[in-house]
Amino acid sequence: MSQQPLPLFGFDRLTLGLYLALVAIGWLMIFAVNYNPEAPYAFFDLSHMAGKQLAFMVICFVMMFVVMLSDWSFWRTLALPLYLVSILLLPGTLLFGREINGAQAWYHIGGFTFQPSEIAKFGACLAMAAFLSSPGIDLRQWRDRIIAFSIFLIPAVLVLLQSDTGSALVFFSFLLVLYREGLSPVLYALGFGTAALVILGLKFDPPSYTAAWLIALVNYLLINRLRERKRLWWAVFVALIPLTIWWMYPLRWLLGELEVSLPEEQMHLLVLMPHILLFIAAFLPNYWKKNSLIQGQMRVWLVLLSLSVTLIFAANAFFNLLAPHQQQRIKIWLRPKEAASEARGAAYNLLHSKMAIGSGGLLGKGTLEGNMTKLKYVPEQSTDFIFCTVGEEQGFVGVIGLVGIFLWLLWRITILAERQRSNFSRIYAYSVAGIIFVHLVVNIGMTMGLLPIIGIPLPFISAGGSSLIGFSLMIAVLLKLDSNRNLA
């Protein structure tokens, strides 16, 4: 018996309802941030932030209606052309775009601005789904891996050239999709390990102490494998711990007695010497064992340790090459004491963001009653920091409710993904879920100081037509594909 399509507009009503709820909450929060008691109905004015958002909401609803009237196969057939068009829009901002908050990522059209990276995310979802669902694709093959990575790395690099680090980071959400489709977990372990080493290199300055503790950890593992004179080995290992902590005091005294002057950087590097010597002494007895398997393991350890130490120093050196405002954002996240002296800028934003969220208490101050919202203590509160308004006016209960709706939506999208008969539809659904998830985690994390301030909107909530159109288009196509799942 042939499969029949679901009735016209037989879309998943729960997903649509969650989408509409988030859009409505977002508009209410934007209205609250920009509320003026002297002009309570200004939201009908397109010069008002809430008025603009209302206009974009109407555009999105019309767009979703048009998508539901389209043929479901249209989106797979034109996946590559739509992706290429979205990619071609990105470099144009470097020539014809407008710079906002240090990022030249917007086109200015009439009285509105348009951010092509939001559409590029949608295009990348289609392209990734089309590629991975093609016959013969196997992520165990390096050729297919390279193509899959290129699909999201190309727009990520182009967006990074616009100085929009936050939007570039979002494209790495496709790693979640690739994991679901069978990419080796070993690559993710290496990726997370690399990220951890980079964070350590950025957090601790000078990096020589971080490298010293890393070598000490490897020394512990090496000594634990030895069988002879273990007490002597452990005695030396334990003695190096206080020496690492207080190394600079005896070193400065010794150099003073010898009347030798060294730059501060070189003095810090000397802390590595005893750990390196112990590593060599513990490494050689393990390597000399007449066992090819053990020798192979030792070589791997040596290579990984060398790369790890190099990466720590490289991350620290890269930090020193960043622009001052980029360094400040990292300091706010990883070195808060060092950044505490900043009265304005990112430190100011984060301080007042946390104050606004905390001042809401359990139940919040009430809609339109947020003092910090009214007095504009937090810049960009309609866009990147709109979560502060939720925390201040709706309190802990409101925050939990909003996050709960997001998690419910993500859970529902995964349900839709798993019930698809088409690989294209399933992969597309997971791509959409991954992008929303990364936006949610990064936006809330940065407003609470858990992640660096990189400036990405909260989906469906933050003001901005490009963001709302991009996410609405993702949801609309998902609903369309799901409503025709019986045809796959």
Stretches with model-predicted labels:
Residues 1-3, 236-245, 442-488:
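A juxtamembrane structural motif centered on a specific transmembrane helix
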Residues 359, 423-430, 483-487:
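Membrane-interacting alpha-helical segments
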Residues 2-19, 50:
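N-terminal membrane topogenic signal
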Residues 111-123, 161-163, 361-366, 453-472:
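Glycine/serine-rich anion-binding loops at beta->alpha junctions
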Residues 16-31, 38-344, 388-446, 473, ...:
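Hydrophobic alpha-helical transmembrane segments of multi-pass inner membrane proteins, especially
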Residues 342-344, 357, 361-394, 424:
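Long extracytoplasmic/lumenal interhelical loops at the membrane interface
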